[in-house]
Design a protein with these regions (language model features):
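Phosphate-binding site recognition
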Residues: 1-348, 352
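A cross-kingdom feature that marks ATP-driven nucleic-acid transaction machinery
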Residues: 311-313, 318-481
Length: 481
C-alpha cells in the first residue's frame, strides 16, 4: 500500500489504511457526487496492491442503451487485461463473478488482494441479475478470503444506499465499511490550487467555489496562465468549452429518470429557499407518486438537493432546495441565457445580474461551511440545527426571509446575514432598522430564545454607529480553516 501526496482526504485515507491492515475480509463501499474524486482516491492509495480493477460502462450513450451483453463483455476484457487465461466469455453475472473467483485464486500469493470495482451501479442493467450475483460472490466466497479487500464505488448514490448500504436482502449487514466522499472545503481548494501552481486570492478561490462547488475534476482544468475569469470562459463559454455538455452528462450518468430529475432541479433553481414537495409536483406537472419520491430521494442522495424544515415550521412542512453550486451557475448563466459569447464572463463581471448571483452563491458557500462558521463563533461543541426562515407577506405585513439560522441547544440562535462585497461592509441606518425589525419579529414569536445577529462576509465589517447591531462577525479567512 502506498501513501501518496493527496490533497485533503486524511480521514478517508486513514479509514482505507485501517481496512487494508485489518487482516480479515473487507467489503467497502465508497460513494459520493460524480466527479468528486472517488476513483482517484482509491487508485492512488491502492495502486501497488490492486490485483483487479474494473469500471462499469457509462449508460450515457446517445446512440443506444448500454446492455447486459456490453457490461459482461467489458468485465471479461478487464479480466483478460489483468492476466486471466483466455476462456469463453461469460453469459451471465453469475458466470462472470465465478471467473473473478478463479482468477483471484490463481494469483493468490497470500498477500492482501485489493479488488476495485468502479461505477458499480452502471453494471446493474435491467433484469441482469447483477445484485444476486454480487451477493453470491461475497456471501459464498469473498467473505471467507481473509486477504481480500473488495472496494466498490458509485456516483449513483441512491443505488449505493438502497442496494448496498441499506440492503434488506442477501447483502444485509455484509458491508464492513462505507465512506462518503464530499467535495473539497475552501481550505482544501486552496491547497489544490497551490499544488497545481495556480495563484489565486481567497476572494477568487471563493468565487471559483461558487461555480464549481469544490469538485476537483472541474478544478483540474484550470490553466495557471489564465485569470479566474479566463478560466471560467474556457470551461463554460468557449466554442469548445471543456464543460460544455457537463450538465446533461452529469444527470444522464447518475439518474435513471434523468430528464425528470433535471426538470425538478431546474424548478428548484428558481428560488434559493426552495419549495415544498407539493409545489414541486404542481409546477413540474409530475404525479407525486412513488417514482416522484424516488427521484427526490436520488437527488438528495447525490447531494444535489437537501430537505429541511424552515425555522418555526412543523416537521410536516418540509422544503427541498438545490445546493449544488455547479447546477446553480449552469442554470443561471449557461442555460438560462443561452450564451454564445466566448468571453462572456470576462465581459460581464461587473453587471448587476452577476453581483446578485454572487450574493446567493456566497450564501450557499456559507451553508456548506457550517462547521467552520461555528468554530469561528466558538460554538463548535454546541449541538445545533441549521435552517432558513420563510415568512410569506400579506396585506397587513411584509414577508421575511433569512437564509441561515443556527438554532443552538443552549437556546441561542445565530441569525446570520451573509454578504459578499469586495470592499469592507458598512451597515447603514436604513439596513440597521430592517435588521432590528427582524429581530423583534423573531423575539415576539419565540420568547424563550435569544437571537444574536451574526455577520458573515468575505470582507471586514466597518465599525460605525450601526455596526454594533451585530453581536458576532465571521470573515472569509474564518471559512478557510
Amino acid at each position: 500500500m502506498i501513501m501518496c501526496e493527496i490533497i485533503g482526504r486524511k480521514k478517508e485515507i486513514a479509514e482505507l489504511k485501517r481496512y487494508y491492515e485489518s487482516g480479515r475480509a473487507e467489503f467497502v463501499a465508497v460513494y459520493g457526487r460524480r466527479r468528486v474524486g472517488k476513483t482517484f482516491l482509491i487508485d492512488e492509495v491502492f495502486h501497488d496492491d490492486m490485483v483487479f480493477h474494473h469500471t462499469g460502462l457509462s449508460p450515457y450513450d446517445r446512440r443506444r442503451k448500454v446492455t447486459l451483453k456490453d457490461q459482461l463483455q467489458n468485465f471479461y476484457f478487464s479480466l483478460l487485461r489483468h492476466g486471466m487465461e483466455d476462456i469463453a466469455q461469460p453469459k451471465s453475472w453469475m458466470e462472470a463473478f465465478f471467473l473473478l473467483e478463479r482468477f483471484l485464486e490463481t494469483c493468490d500469493n497470500g498477500s492482501r488482494q485489493v479488488v476495485f470495482i468502479d461505477e458499480l451501479p452502471w453494471m446493474d442493467t435491467a433484469r441482469s441479475g447483477f445484485l444476486t450475483a454480487l451477493e453470491a460472490f461475497w456471501n459464498g466466497w469473498g467473505n471467507m478470503r481473509h486477504n481480500l479487500l473488495l472496494v466498490v464505488c458509485g456516483s449513483a448514490t441512491s443505488w449505493m444506499l438502497d442496494n448496498l448500504i441499506n440492503n434488506k436482502g442477501g447483502l444485509y449487514g455484509r458491508l464492513t465499511g462505507e465512506i462518503k466522499l464530499s467535495p473539497f472545503t475552501l481550505k482544501e481548494c486552496e491547497e489544490f490550487y497551490q499544488s497545481r501552481g495556480i495563484r489565486m486570492s481567497r476572494y477568487n478561490i471563493t468565487q471559483a467555489y461558487m461555480i464549481m462547488g469544490g469538485i476537483p475534476f472541474y478544478m483540474n482544468f484550470f490553466n495557471p496562465s489564465y485569470s479566474l475569469a479566463q478560466n471560467i470562459d474556457a470551461l463554460f463559454f468557449d466554442r469548445q468549452a471543456k464543460l460544455g455538455d457537463e450538465f446533461d452528462r452529469l444527470f444522464n450518468s447518475v439518474f435513471d429518470h434523468a430528464e425528470d430529475c433535471m426538470k425538478i432541479v431546474r424548478f428548484l433553481g428558481t428560488r434559493h429557499a426552495g419549495f415544498t414537495r407539493k409545489e414541486i409536483a404542481e409546477h413540474t406537472g409530475m404525479n407525486p407518486n412513488g417514482d416522484f419520491t424516488k427521484m427526490l430521494k436520488a437527488l438528495m442522495g447525490s447531494d444535489f438537493v437537501v430537505k429541511y424544515t424552515p425555522f418555526g415550521f412543523s416537521q410536516r412542512e418540509e422544503y427541498y432546495k438545490l445546493i449544488d453550486s455547479f447546477c446553480w451557475f449552469w442554470l443561471h448563466f449557461k442555460e438560462k441565457k443561452a450564451v454564445n459569447q466566448t468571453d462572456y464572463w470576462q465581459q460581464h463581471l461587473k453587471e448587476g445580474d452577476v453581483a446578485s448571483w454572487r450574493g446567493i452563491a456566497f450564501e450557499e458557500v456559507c451553508l456548506q461551511h457550517i462547521s467552520q462558521i461555528k468554530y469561528a463563533l466558538h460554538i463548535g461543541a454546541v449541538s445545533s440545527q441549521e435552517s432558513s426562515l420563510i415568512v410569506k407577506g400579506s396585506e397587513e405585513a411584509d414577508g421575511m426571509q433569512i437564509d441561515l439560522l443556527i438554532d443552538r441547544a443552549d437556546d441561542a440562535v445565530n441569525v446570520c446575514e451573509m454578504k459578499f462585497y469586495k470592499a469592507p461592509y458598512a451597515v447603514t441606518k436604513g439596513y440597521a432598522q430592517v435588521l432590528n425589525s427582524r429581530l423583534q419579529a423573531l423575539e415576539e414569536k419565540n420568547p424563550a430564545k435569544t437571537f444574536l445577529l451574526t455577520y458573515v462576509g468575505n470582507s471586514e465589517l466597518v465599525s460605525n454607529e450601526y455596526s454594533d447591531i451585530f453581536r458576532a462577525s465571521v470573515t472569509l479567512d474564518d471559512l478557510f480553516i
